[in-house]
Amino acid sequence: MTVTDAPSANPTRRSRTIARVAAVQALFQCEQSGDTAETVISQFIRHRRISSTASFDDGHIPDADLKLFQEIVLGVTRRQDDIDAKLSDVLPEQWPLPRLDPVLRALLRAAVFEIGTDTPDRIIINEYLDVAHGFFSGDEPKMVNGILDTLSRRANDGNV
């Protein structure tokens, strides 16, 4: 990775990465608390510096891309049954969706929601691999890579 490719070198990219991390956290919170996506989004905006602007302020980390954050959280909650079915089709038999760590489940749901959007799948996969490495130190990132790669190939072949 060159300096210009690094997330910190591009404030817009960095704000999108932060939005994805926040979305995974929000989806986890929705599942654990039973709160609606709208309630959790509101809490994140009030308490976790989620805003509609994304710029560096005297070297501080930029805020998350609010639009992307909301799209992911609301999109996943609205399409969760479809997303879960796609995940269940590719998960190893010994790892059904309910058995997965709740953070891993939230991460996969967010990533699957974004696959097939205007953002190239390779970027989505790389972003969520980075997020997975932030949350997990074991084999989970490898699992994320395999699952997302399979779903991306299926989507591009029209088999999803």
From Swiss-Prot:
It comes from the Bacteria. Keywords: RNA-binding, Transcription, Transcription antitermination, Transcription regulation. SUPFAM superfamilies: NusB-like (SSF48013). GO terms for cellular component: cytosol. GO terms for molecular function: RNA binding. GO terms for biological process: DNA-templated transcription termination; transcription antitermination. InterPro entries: NusB-like_sf, NusB_fam, NusB_RsmB_TIM44. PANTHER family: ANTITERMINATION NUSB DOMAIN-CONTAINING PROTEIN, N UTILIZATION SUBSTANCE PROTEIN B-RELATED. Involved in transcription antitermination. Required for transcription of ribosomal RNA (rRNA) genes. Binds specifically to the boxA antiterminator sequence of the ribosomal RNA (rrn) operons. Belongs to the NusB family. This is Transcription antitermination protein NusB.
